[in-house]
């Protein structure tokens, strides 16, 4: 999914669900948004090398000119889900995320994502990927543990 942070709100306005691998995803992003600085928020496991790959997913994204914002390790699932819920509707009843109607896969994922009895996302249902991607973005940009918390603070190096 593609979005921007504006006035401390997250606006999701596009999604890419048809890319068959990370290289195809990077090319699609570059073709749709050739003039924009792109920040990516992948799953931290994207830095792991598989036995049949010469590059990790994060290396591919970084090599395509995107700024990697993934943490060294993924946040706890419950914390990430709570971060998404807080942006959807906080304690004051305010929503700080808007998802454009064209983002059908993300909306479907948000509506149909289920969880196991242990509280983990049900990976068998097939609805976890887009919801997870939204969670990683929100965790990184709006989590009060990070200095940014939805506000630009200049250059950050990790």
Residue ranges and their predicted role:
Residues 6-122, 144-145, 155-158:
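Mg2+-dependent endonuclease catalytic cores in nucleic-acid-processing enzymes, primarily RNase H-like
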